[in-house]
Amino acid sequence: MTCPDKPGQLINWFICSLCVPRVRKLWSSRRPRTRRNLLLGTACAIYLGFLVSQVGRASLQHGQAAEKGPHRSRDTAEPSFPEIPLDGTLAPPESQGNGSTLQPNVVYITLRSKRSKPANIRGTVKPKRRKKHAVASAAPGQEALVGPSLQPQEAAREADAVAPGYAQGANLVKIGERPWRLVRGPGVRAGGPDFLQPSSRESNIRIYSESAPSWLSKDDIRRMRLLADSAVAGLRPVSSRSGARLLVLEGGAPGAVLRCGPSPCGLLKQPLDMSEVFAFHLDRILGLNRTLPSVSRKAEFIQDGRPCPIILWDASLSSASNDTHSSVKLTWGTYQQLLKQKCWQNGRVPKPESGCTEIHHHEWSKMALFDFLLQIYNRLDTNCCGFRPRKEDACVQNGLRPKCDDQGSAALAHIIQRKHDPRHLVFIDNKGFFDRSEDNLNFKLLEGIKEFPASAVSVLKSQHLRQKLLQSLFLDKVYWESQGGRQGIEKLIDVIEHRAKILITYINAHGVKVLPMNE
């Protein structure tokens, strides 16, 4: 047992050593209990007074030591609590003059801020992408296209000639809109075919996930990038009466003639035809696959740099007539007769006296569904007989509205096939109208149609049409921004969804069949 070194502890030890044996002896003796309790209480009171005196002496010594410390004026006095350093470290305790360390009476707490992880919003955070340098290998007898491009098309006629499938029926110079002109702006070099735009800039077709949407094929993505990003090697008019222009794009073989065929081309239309881009994406989502790839592009050398739709030039389209802009001449009356004959359905070869064309019966059902959703009237209702047209509509401008009295003789327009595939149609000039009210929808487009494609109807009935359109249209950066971002795109989708509900109601009310059309 060690002896205490301080005076206070020595006294406590002495009292305890004397009192404890005597208390035990007193407790075990036979004295009266009253006297024993009195003695025990007196001893406890004496010890309690001693403890109080010890506490008072200790507090007095602590106050004197504080007065001897370094003096600080009240003007510069720190708060009574120590500050927590911003860097998360603690300062060492202050040292006394005698070399001893003053023990602080405050517990220091180091606060470590919680690291906030940024929100990864799909479609807004662009990951880093590896640069891939692919070398295109050309097959014998074909010219390789540099970068993301198309397979070389067969040789076409000169670009300054009348273009099949595009020329005469598309009078794109609108009243009050300035005609096309060449503007020397940024990214355009004067002199011959060198209107090259910078090729090192970021692609306008943005794909941030590992793969593109399933309804867009690899060829679709490659062609979209070709139209959106390739430099322009030449600019030629389609026809003297048309406002459209052919852009001869970079990507042909070195030394190739600057014309469509050896070089890839795109048909550049005016800003008012921007709905062509929406039509392309809707066609792919519905599984029709009848439109040509279309993107939106800012043409620095024309139209003051405003976004314009550019559609892939396809040299495989059949030649079109100048009056109806169609590869097959049909009137409304003959078209209704073809619908009754159901030409080529279920593999049946039509009889010679049936008057059938080479076009499959299901193609008309797909066209009618597509045209109704976008309210395209320039194919099946060129005279605007099924709705109330506006003054700026082509049928009013051309004076065709009074011809509705004889609808059977009204000619169909923009009925185009491919040379190597006459059974299927190609939907061109797909300018849609989103401002058509519900009471002014053109139901004439659905006359005579008794079947609709099951794949397209299933998409319209599902709850995923909006999601797919947003995902698909987001790929085209220029189109997305030109429509006001997501808010503007949502308004267009609202119109399509409402028309889809009306079409489903029409199908149920008229007993129209929904069939698989994957012939």
Curated annotation (Swiss-Prot):
Keywords in alphabetical order: Glycoprotein, Golgi apparatus, Membrane, Signal-anchor, Transmembrane, Transmembrane helix
Transmembrane portions of the chain: 38-55
Membrane topology: Single-pass type II membrane protein
Record topological domains on the Extracellular side: 56-519
Record topology, Cytoplasmic segments: 1-37
Glycan-bearing residues: N289
GO cellular component, as recorded: Golgi apparatus; Golgi membrane
Protein family per UniProt: Belongs to the GASK family.
Designated name of the protein: Golgi-associated kinase 1B
Organism, as annotated: Homo sapiens
